[in-house]
Amino acid sequence: MRVKINLKCSECGSLNYLTSKNKQNHPEKIQVPKFCPKDRKVTLHVES
């Protein structure tokens, strides 16, 4: 079952991306480097 999740910037805290994941296959929180338009640089985004 796929669920929708938000990816939050770890530096400024803004919610920049909406994605989905399968909680049965990946129960841990997602952490991916993405571009933050507020900081105007690539930062680590974590699942919120």
Swiss-Prot record:
Record GO biological process: translation
Protein name, entry field: Large ribosomal subunit protein bL33B
GO molecular function: structural constituent of ribosome
Species, as recorded: Streptococcus thermophilus (strain ATCC BAA-250 / LMG 18311)
Coiled coil: none
Similarity section: Belongs to the bacterial ribosomal protein bL33 family.
Cellular component, GO, one term: cytoplasm
Pfam families xref list: Ribosomal_L33
Keywords (A to Z) from UniProt: Ribonucleoprotein, Ribosomal protein
